[in-house]
């Protein structure tokens, strides 16, 4: 029975990670990002696709390509995108995400 719960918890974590990645892509495509220039911000964030495997619980450490993509993003661009993404649950009439460190 414990293995079923563990599997369910792992599946939930994987689903949440995948959902967050999808939400980030949606934000990139549908929201105006307050970055100058916008095209540069969008292109940089699109480059984060190489980080997708790292978002799944139990995955290995981030690849060199992922780290390089994150390093190349403008600070304001990343912060504005995270701020916009955090608003999505409320805009969809969902409760805010509450994530633990575990």
UniProtKB/Swiss-Prot annotation:
Keywords: Disulfide bond, Secreted, Signal. It is found in: Secreted. Stamen- and tapetum-specific. Residues 1-30 form the signal peptide. The keyword Secreted applies. Disulfide bonds join 41-77, 51-66, 67-92, 79-99. GO terms for cellular component: extracellular region. PANTHER family: PROTEIN 108 (PTHR35501:SF8), PROTEIN YY1 (PTHR35501). Belongs to the A9/FIL1 family. This is Protein 108.
């Amino acid at each position: 029975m414990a293995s079923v719960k563990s599997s369910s918890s792992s599946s939930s974590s994987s689903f949440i990670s995948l959902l967050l990645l999808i939400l980030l892509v949606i934000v990139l495509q549908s929201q105006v990002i307050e970055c100058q220039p916008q095209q540069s911000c969008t292109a940089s964030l699109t480059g984060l696709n190489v980080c997708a495997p790292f978002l799944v619980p139990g995955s290995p450490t981030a690849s060199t390509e992922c780290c390089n993509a994150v390093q190349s993003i403008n600070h304001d661009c990343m912060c504005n995108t995270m701020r916009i993404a955090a608003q999505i649950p409320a805009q969809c009439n969902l409760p805010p995400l509450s994530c633990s460190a575990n």
